Amino acid sequence: MALLSLACRVWLSAALPMTGDEALFYWWARFLDYGYYDHPPMVGWWLAAVRALLGDAVWALRLPSVLLPLGVGAAIWWAWAPVSRSRAAWAVLLYWLMPVNWLNSLITTDTPLILWSAWAVAAVVRAEQVAMRAVASSQGGDGATGWLKAAGGWYALSGVFLGLAFLSKYFVALLGVALAAYFLLAARKRWLGLVLMVLCALPAVALNLHWNLTHCWTNIMFNVFNRNEDAVFAWGNVGTYVGMMVYLISPVVLWQAWRHRGAVWRTARVHALLSCVALVPLLLFGLMSGKKVIGLHWVLGFYPFVFVLLALCLPSDRLPGARKGLVVFLAVHLLAVFAVAQTSLPQWHKVKYYNRLVEALRAEQIVQQVRVPGVVLMSNGYSSSSILGYAAREHMPVFGLGSFHARQDDLIVDHARYEGQTLRIIRQSRPDLAEYAPYFDSVRLLSYAQDGQPFYAVEGVNFHYAAYRDGVMAEVNRRYYRFPSWLPVWQCSFCQRLCGAARCAP
């Protein structure tokens, strides 16, 4: 089963075009840093290592995601085999049978988060096993620290993994809440274990804090302020989240859990740590879903533990039935993927996002049409810039306001260097040339087509940086760099270019 799913992911990693987010992370690896605009740096570090070893091919960049289910499965086995080798094996098998572990080969910020979260939980599970054995055998006795001497290394290792998860994505905070709930409600006498975990995770937190202090607090401005300004409660979002979780966990698993709900409840009480890490983050996402659409990939860092809970609670004679149901569920997905694989690009021309498909699949041809010697290529959005830049093998800056997502160019691109040059700004939609005229001596519209899809480029001659700074960068500052007065800003390269200070007046 592991080899079959691995083969499927390898095939998809080579067959699927690069997405905008993946291309963005590729550029993170090209401009290596210890932090990036949207998120902490781990996926950029991973891709930098992959590039050094295997090069820039799409399949190589996706290799961490391709291997991810094997790493998570190993963590599950290592953590719960001491409880029951057969049940741990069932947990790994059920997890591996889920369609997401056959069909997901995309590299995202969640990829390292999922791995490090799984190993953080595995290490604390082992720590608790050792600690409870130490207490039971009177090594130090109840209330003494003999258990900490016996299990301290595992608690520390869990903290290190939590730190690595923190440097992957801030959603690890939900795992932190789950662990805190466990120690508060079920393991209060071993609270020093939690303290040791926190201490070992703190260096990663300090590293990220320093990066934010010296890089405009972009992680905080993006994740806390800019992306949530217009959030309003909607029951539809809650319903979408519930439906997504029903699909992800699968009707098969949920039906089995309902049929054996008494066993689920008893197992949840006996395995309190597992219950907390499996359920608390998903419940917290449920609470957030009223004001925020929860992405499917967001929950995958906590999703594996649901299958451990299922494997431990179901009667042994019911596990083969669960396996058969999941095989059928998986087969439906594989047949759908096989059917899609038989189609060609023109057959999708009536799909709403056909333009994005063309851009992803034909990026090299688009670049070839627009590129001319002596002209700088840009785009009006991060997704297009990242994908087309990957195809061109040169960084393609974003021109204009862009969106609140992925504003990495604010930190690394100095538009002053393009003063006096001719630019071509590639766009998916037909532009209004009046929006570009203030920044050039002259502008003209160039029209192209690729696989029946029109796209455009605005050619501007003799770029005027001062006008761009006053017209575009000042508005970007007003929208995305309104730091709260209480937030200390040590350095901000964007503001330094705009006004010569760490923060600029809006």
Located regions from the model:
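Membrane-proximal, lumen/periplasm-facing interface regions of secretory-pathway glyco-
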Residues: L296, A322-P373, Y382-A406, I425-C504
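Membrane-interface alpha helices of multi-pass inner-membrane proteins
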Residues: F31, A151-K169, A180-A181, F285
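Transmembrane-lumen/periplasm boundary regions of multi-pass, lipid-linked membrane glycan transferases
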Residues: L164, L175-R269, V277, L282, ...
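Transmembrane-helix motifs of polytopic, lipid-linked glycan transferases
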Residues: L63-R85, W119, A123
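Short helix- or helix-capping micro-motifs
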Residues: A2, A88-M98, L162, F166
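Short acidic/glycine- and proline-prone juxtamembrane loop motifs at membrane-interface regions
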Residues: S105-L113
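Specific aromatic-rich, kink-prone transmembrane helix
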Residues: R30, G73-A75, L94, P112-R133, ...
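Membrane-interface transmembrane helices that cradle and orient dolichyl/undecaprenyl
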Residues: A81-S86, A120-L157, A263
